[in-house]
């Protein structure tokens, strides 16, 4: 996933650059199988919808890659190697995130990425992206929804914290 908060940051994606060239677009987020476009308050969706859809269609029919290079999945994923029981715990956490939590969050235009698991404290660190990263209720979603589900299915989890 990739989250572009301004046109300058969008240089890694020709589609994001094109979307930011549309007056009123203020944010572009690419999820694993969706994209979210954010607009300024001063602009109305009725004027933005057609040029946004045209930019998306033009990009995907052109055959260009979504990102320059092979950086399609840049994001807060953990590079650590877990072993033994901890590897099983992390696999369970990632499975729950992928099958139950991420699809629900994607419906609101966001994504949650696994960052790391601290086996000593039982804390899971997650990275909220897209609409979720700026949403005022994201902390409540993280604590009430995600933390409760992970603690229920994976007893070794004691807490969930957001990373930036």
Label the model's feature ranges.
Residues 1-164:
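Domain-level signature for proteins that mediate thiol-based redox and metal-cofactor handling
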